[in-house]
Amino acid sequence: MLSKAHAKVNLSLDVIGKRKDGYHLLKMLMQTIDLYDLIQIKKIKKGIIIDCDREYIPKDRRNLAYKAAELFLDRYNIDSGVRIDITKNIPVAAGLAGGSTDAATVLKIMRDIFRSDISNKELKEIALDIGADVPFCIEGGTALCEGIGEKITPIKNFKNQILVLVKPNFGLSTKDVYNNLKVEKIYIHPNTTKLIQSIEEDNLKSVARNMRNVLENVTLRKYKTLNSIKSNFIELGALGSMMSGSGPSVFGLFDDMLKAQICYDNMKEKYKEVFITRTI
């Protein structure tokens, strides 16, 4: 069984506190985009086999797809195993939920293969044990995600909007970025209510004005390349530009495909991983 595993971007990301166990409390607007990996799963007699077209992708428990399969098999006492083939298109360690969406897609395919009676709610319970972005990736679309990622409220779909996405030639550790964030020193928070209202009113310019990611407080100081990319996007006609997740991917939001194509061509001269895509 073959399925697409779609990436996401954050239209906003706010950190509003920290739990005693160290987890950060989040308030973020998440959006699925039409950039995807391909996941194919076949039933085998025993075990979990991962294969991927990128050699640097781990094929053991470090891979969230493996972890998803293992949790599913254990939870439902399934004696069979699975072979998972991954074709990677989503950049790795990029703030685009590449690993999380692969894991979510594995859970959905395994439901189809083994237990079609399982609800999305139940799948999301398993997903939360894998990572904060995985529950959102089960549903996709446009949603407000709160807590540690488990509280998901769908909103009006912000679909068919044009994005140009740049992933610079380095990766960032989500854990390191959050560990370097000083929550008490976040002085400007996203106006998430205004952002949602802008989406509901189809006001693209207002959406662009209200996009904000507080993790940029950490990354923009340390990585000047990210400042340059954001500035370049605005110079090349983007309505707004923001880092997605914990980075380092940065996207520009456009209202015109010709401008987006010119921007893509310009960025492609400087960076290897550049994409034109749309929200879905």
UniProtKB/Swiss-Prot annotation:
Residues at which ATP binds: P91, V92, A93, A94, G95, L96, A97, G98, G99, S100, T101
Domain of life, per lineage: Bacteria
Catalytic activity reported: 4-CDP-2-C-methyl-D-erythritol + ATP = 4-CDP-2-C-methyl-D-erythritol 2-phosphate + ADP + H(+)
GO biological process assignments: isopentenyl diphosphate biosynthetic process, methylerythritol 4-phosphate pathway; terpenoid biosynthetic process
GO molecular function: 4-(cytidine 5'-diphospho)-2-C-methyl-D-erythritol kinase activity; ATP binding
Keyword Transferase found: yes
Pathway: Isoprenoid biosynthesis; isopentenyl diphosphate biosynthesis via DXP pathway; isopentenyl diphosphate from 1-deoxy-D-xylulose 5-phosphate: step 3/6
Entry annotation: catalytic residues: K8, D133
InterPro entries linked to this entry: GHMP_kinase_C_dom, GHMP_kinase_C_sf, GHMP_kinase_N_dom, IspE, Ribosomal_Su5_D2-typ_SF, Ribsml_uS5_D2-typ_fold_subgr
Family to which the UniProt record says this protein belongs: Belongs to the GHMP kinase family. IspE subfamily.
UniProt xrefs under PANTHER family: 4-DIPHOSPHOCYTIDYL-2-C-METHYL-D-ERYTHRITOL KINASE, CHLOROPLASTIC
Protein's name according to its UniProt entry: 4-diphosphocytidyl-2-C-methyl-D-erythritol kinase
Lineage: Bacteria, Bacillati, Bacillota, Clostridia, Eubacteriales
Gene from which this protein is expressed: ispE
